Amino acid sequence: MDCKVPPTPQAHRIPLDPEAAAELAVGFKALADPNRITLLTLIAAEESGEACVCDLTEPLGLGQPTVSHHLKVLVDAGLLTREKRGTWSYYSVVPGAQQDLFNAMTERTTP
């Protein structure tokens, strides 16, 4: 008895190579923390499209070092950008980065 589901006739799935899987894992690991998801939504909701770390501590109820750590993880995963202005860092969401992460899992097909 074969338990494999046959591929759909329209498309053939392409498995991820180990390097691509490792890159995806970084992004998904960054999103695996509720505080990081909250940070992304807070920054995305800003009218200016960016937020200073000093404005993100209170909504999360976390200290500045902890918030800065979470922001660094999101930057390293390519989900946020960071711009230093004087003593403060400002963060903005990378356009399309979240969607690209999810598309990499679902759109790995060839006709």
Regions found by a protein language model. Give the residues of each.
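Base-recognition residues in the alpha-helical recognition helix of bacterial helix-turn-helix
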Residues: T41, S68-K72, T87
